Design a protein with these regions (language model features):
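Short, positively charged and aromatic/hydrophobic N-terminal segments
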Residues: 51, 60-61, 69-71
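Cysteine-centered motifs
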Residues: 12-15, 52-54
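Auxiliary Fe-S-binding modules of radical SAM enzymes
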Residues: 74-88, 92-97, 295-383
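Conserved C-terminal portion of the radical SAM core fold
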Residues: 241-301, 319-342
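Hydrophobic faces of well-ordered beta-strands that scaffold small-molecule active sites
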Residues: 97-101, 158-160, 191-193, 217-221, ...
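Core AdoMet radical
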Residues: 125-145, 149-172, 187-200, 216-242, ...
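N-terminal [4Fe-4S]-dependent radical SAM core
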Residues: 70, 74-159
Length: 383
């Protein structure tokens, strides 16, 4: 290839500097958005040396022209963002569906280990389907979840999603029994384990690392915010540093790692939320979930809203939230997988915002707006 030839000899200092930078960065630029960014930065440098007749520089300019042609085609077929179904295709040949579980865990932020009362926004009823009841075993919940989905796709495979509360909070042997009970159910091909950043001991990581040699294991951390002042306000009981440490330790074991953040938490400005995208992008995350802040009946945050509504910005206008998400996505690392952008709570529990949209309807509106704005994931990403 042209850049292999360029590297063999350099005949002037200017070309030496530009060529070395070009070669080093080109070898690392494995994503179209990164390549495009490289083209712009290199061209800005090279244009000052266009009168140079070094053969190496001529080849660099030729490669840049070729890249420009490639980018012209790439712009027409550019993916708006990396979605979760496409991510799963890296691991599974057919359709895979997550089944949410309530395995009877609690939370160190509820039982006094870290704090009492839990996070101010939290009501686990909002994300547990009807079949998730703690009096049912993990296996029974999975079988009922399978029946719910199997009528549409008889060949479907499933991921056991340990979702409710903190699913790594317990004795190691008890945790192992729960996970292995799930994996013993027919057609369950992996685990997704939701937890807190401060609840991942090394002994459990050792076990999950070994388990992942034979099955799919994704660890999903509730990060919620990158600002410690916000984490204190919502009574999370952990810091941003704890989240960074947990993600890095997990990724170092070769495990896929997911993160979850909430947009619109009290006290956070639009600039705060957009700045968060850069912090999230620096983490070795594979997947990310976003969702809007929802006020849920019976939570401490709902009471706070009654007392100080001026502290909250609830995105009552869905188009305002879409505008934020578009700007956020553009600032994210180009290879990060985006699993979702909204959350849906039962109508009887939801105070606000109530958009009346299904997830797929929101995604359609988001994609439409991104196309109108010529926006895509990573467009404004700055390493």
């Amino acid at each position: 290839m042209a850049w292999e030839i360029v590297d063999k000899s350099v005949t002037c200092d200017n070309c030496d500097t530009v060529t070395f930078s070009f070669l080093s960065n080109l070898q690392r630029a494995t994503h179209p958005v990164l390549l495009e960014s490289l083209y712009v930065s290199v061209f800005q440098t090279v244009k000052y040396f266009v009168d140079c007749r070094c053969p190496e520089m001529m080849l660099v300019l030729l490669v840049i022209r070729q890249l420009l042609s490639i980018f012209g085609m790439a712009m027409e077929t550019r993916t708006l963002y990396n979605d979760f179904p496409t991510f799963l295709k890296r691991f599974f040949p057919g359709k895979v569906q997550k089944i949410s579980l309530n395995a009877g865990f609690t939370c160190p932020n509820r039982d006094g280990t870290v704090g009492y009362g839990g996070c101010t926004y939290c009501n686990n009823q909002t994300f547990n389907p009807e079949y998730c009841r703690t009096e049912k075993t993990v296996a029974v919940q999975l079988e009922e979840g399978k029946r719910f989905f199997a009528h549409k796709y008889p060949e479907m495979k499933y991921l056991a999603y340990f979702q409710a509360y903190t699913n790594t909070y317990g004795e190691l042997e008890a945790l192992k029994r729960k996970y292995e009970e799930a994996l013993a159910v027919d057609d369950v091909v992996g685990l997704v384990i939701g937890t807190r950043p401060d609840c991942m001991p090394d002994a459990l990581l050792d076990y999950l690392e070994t388990l992942a040699k034979g099955t799919f294991v994704l660890v999903e951390y509730g990060i919620e915010s990158t600002l410690d002042r916000t984490l204190r306000r919502i009574n999370r009981g952990h810091t941003w540093q704890a989240a960074m440490d947990a993600v890095e330790r997990t990724a170092a074991r070769g495990l896929p790692v997911g993160g979850h953040v909430i947009l619109g938490l009290p006290g956070e400005s639009r600039e705060d939320m957009l700045g968060q995208a850069a912090d999230i992008s620096r983490l070795p995350l594979d997947t990310l979930k976003l969702h809007q802040l929802q006020l849920i009946r019976g939570t401490r945050m709902a009471r706070e809203y009654e007392e100080r509504p001026e502290d909250f910005h609830l995105f009552d206008d869905v188009d305002e939230y879409i505008a934020l998400v578009v700007d956020y996505i553009q600032r994210l690392r180009p290879d990060l997988v985006l699993e979702r952008f909204v959350s849906q709570s039962p109508k009887e529990l939801l105070i606000a915002p109530d958009w009346g949209l299904k997830n797929y309807e929101f995604n359609h509106r988001l994609q439409k707006r991104m196309k109108e704005l010529d926006a895509w994931q990573g467009k404004l990403y700055n390493q």
